[in-house]
Amino acid sequence: MNSILQNQKPVEFFSAERIKIEIDGQQILWRDMTLKIDSRIGEHTVGKIKYIASLQQINIYDAAIDKDEDIKIIISGRSNISNENGTSNDKIFLNGIIDDIKLSEIKTGSLVVEITCISKSIILDRIPRYRSFQDPSLTYSAIAEEINKNYGANGEKIISVGEDMKEVPRMTIQYNETDWEYLKRIASYTGQPLMASSNKVLVGFFKNMPAQTPNLAYSYFGKETEAERTYYRVEGTEVYSVSTPIKLKIRNRVSGEEVENDYYVIESRIYNEGNTLKCEYKLGKQTDYFVDPIPHEKIRGAVIEARTVHIARTDESKSEHGRAEGSSDNLEGRTIGAKPLNKYIEKFKNESQNENVKEKVKTKDIAVMTLDLTEGLMDLGENEQSFEDKYAGKSYFPYITPYSQSNTGFTPAPEVNDRVALYFPSGNETKAFVIGALNNDGNGRFTNPDKRNFTLGNSQSGANAGKPMYDFTLNSEVFSISVGSIIDMSSGGSVNISGTSKVNIDSSGTMDISGTSTVNLKSSGADTNIEGNSEVNMKVSSSKISIDSSSIGINASDEFTADADGITIGAGASTVDIKGGEVKIK
């Protein structure tokens, strides 16, 4: 291996005959074993063992088969290298759960045992759950803390987060995903993997773990490329698990320069050849983007019911609800992950620019709302599946408005606390939008085809700082209302009808103008005319009719009649003139 220089520490190996198997804490006696353990980033570690066991321990296997709970298994080996105290090191190859056991008795009085086991990470991959993490400022550690509460006792934490895993790049919703699927997906947004490591689940690599320097003197070493990434593959007797940091100093075949790089084990396969345990592992460079972003396929096309927390607009200078009450991160062009640009796309862009490239318009002033998904999530799952929305109201979601740009839609916004339908058109939950209101108590009235009305709720003068609950403004030349029978206008306060030019109130039949108090007919600028085609009648049921003016003229072309129990003309006047061609006083 002239191209690889190593610190020449002793070569570590493990004898297959010194492998130890424990099932639920009891050590197993075995012979003639065949062992294979496969692990890789983003997958559970799977082990397959076949050996001959003693019939004296058949009760251990019977108990394991009959047990309803998980059966724990630990597979470990003893190294040839001793520690500072002279004691040989033990290394755990798999700490997990038995998935399947097969027993076969043979004529020699022994048992053939076949066991398939899987890492403890599998317990995260059993129950699909529904959770909202809609706060875009959440960190991976905060999310892991929430999920850890479902597992372990006495505060034990099965999930650990790498030190480079800070804020999740965008808001996320766990929809019909196991915790394993969800963590694997959100870790992919930073290019980092989810890994099963011993009895832990690791979110991203840990750079503060001590790096190992393999001795490759008796190992096969090779280089390969896959999906635009370069890997190194090593096969030898030294065993390294997935996520282990590795240091390698490699000499460039062309320049002869020695360069030391940091790598991670991203695949590992442990197996035995006779009495020798071997390990084939694959190394990826620490600077690589290890995994591509995983879309949320399970939420594509889904609808979650939600409660409106508040209505807003994204232009904070115009909105009564500022951005402090919600985040518009999911509206401003966030991608599904931070994946580097595909080199073929980059090449195409350099060679031929499309003249019709669509302009990417940044969100400016659009109608949005914040939501509480608790009720909808609870409807989707059973106990231990669904969780309340702890981060309600932390993200803006746009909602459908009729003709929103010209603003000609009619009452497009749901009200606070209305149930609405949040729709997810793609595998990116940040692209969700509200398609309308549903399942609100009282909206059954809309099923009546003879009743098409708009009803306001209770007065909001107190809660709404005295502003009108419904403000209707018409900017047009003509506004006409025509119905077949009745138009009824009623107000608990005042009704004002005003026109800058002329106001006509016309009826082809009888028209009544009445009031329980005073009725005033007044013109401040000109005459007030009362005209009837047949008669004009004025009647007061209790007191009198007063006509008060500097001059009063009464003119009749035919006959003028004044009739009463008593008529007084000119009481208190100095002179009373009664004129006519013929005057009769009787």
Task: Label every model-predicted segment.
Residues 79-94, 253-266, 427-437:
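Short, Lys/Arg- and Gly-enriched loop/turn segments at beta-strand edges
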Residues 1-72, 76, 116-122, 130, ...:
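Juxtamembrane "anchor/assembly" segments of surface/extracellular structural proteins
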Residues 100-107, 267-274, 311-317, 439-443:
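Short, conserved beta-turn/loop elements at beta-strand boundaries and strand-helix junctions
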Residues 58-159, 171-172:
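Surface-exposed cap/loop segments at beta↔alpha junctions
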Residues 63-83, 238-256, 416-420:
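Short coil-to-beta transition motif at edge beta-strands of beta-rich domains
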Residues 112-115, 119-121, 162-224, 260-262, ...:
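Short beta-strand-centered interaction patches in the first periplasmic/extracellular domains
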Residues 48-50, 117, 131-156, 175-196, ...:
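Amphipathic, non-transmembrane alpha-helical segments in extracytoplasmic/periplasmic proteins
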Residues 246, 305-563, 567-569:
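Structural signature for extended repeat/solenoid scaffolds and their inter-repeat hinge/linker regions
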